[in-house]
């Protein structure tokens, strides 16, 4: 299934899964989060996920390298500072956190696989191909970075 590698932008996958999560949210069973404060959990996750994604994008812009997930070969510099000291993929992490918050807001058991499916898809069809390209482009420097910083957290 290599033909899916680097084909669909992760934000589109997140939106599609979010719509799917919403679509199945009326199916039982439902769960009660923190005495019906699921909206607060969702808000914290959405703001947190958005902030993580924003900080990651700002860091890449400051380094004057590509923000396009479909073109990792256009990367001009290996960014290992800022939020990239803790996660090699903070933009995808932010989307996963936001999807998790949306699942909490929906309070529907059938929406829970959404964030998991996002992580599985992005790991296989986005991150692994990116890692191959970055390894070829930056060699030992990238290999050292991967040993020091985890893929997600």
Predicted feature descriptions by range:
Residues 1-81, 93-153:
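Membrane-anchoring alpha-helices and their flanking helix-loop junctions
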Residues 84:
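Solvent-exposed interhelical
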Residues 89:
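Extended, alpha-helix-rich binding/interface surfaces that flank or overlap catalytic cores
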């Amino acid at each position: 299934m290599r033909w899916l590698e680097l084909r669909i932008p992760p934000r589109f996958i997140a939106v599609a899964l979010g719509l799917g999560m919403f679509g199945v949210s009326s199916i039982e069973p439902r769960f009660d989060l923190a005495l019906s404060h699921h909206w607060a959990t969702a808000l914290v996750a959405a703001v947190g996920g958005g902030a993580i994604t924003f900080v990651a994008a700002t860091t890449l812009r400051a380094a004057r390298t590509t923000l396009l997930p479909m073109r990792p070969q256009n990367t001009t510099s290996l960014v290992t500072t800022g939020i990239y000291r803790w996660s090699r993929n903070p933009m995808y992490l932010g989307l996963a956190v936001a999807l998790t918050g949306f699942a909490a807001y929906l309070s529907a058991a059938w929406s829970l696989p959404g964030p998991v499916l996002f992580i599985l898809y992005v790991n296989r069809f986005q991150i692994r191909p990116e890692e191959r390209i970055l390894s070829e482009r930056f060699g030992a420097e990238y290999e050292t970075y991967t040993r020091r910083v985890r893929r997600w957290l």
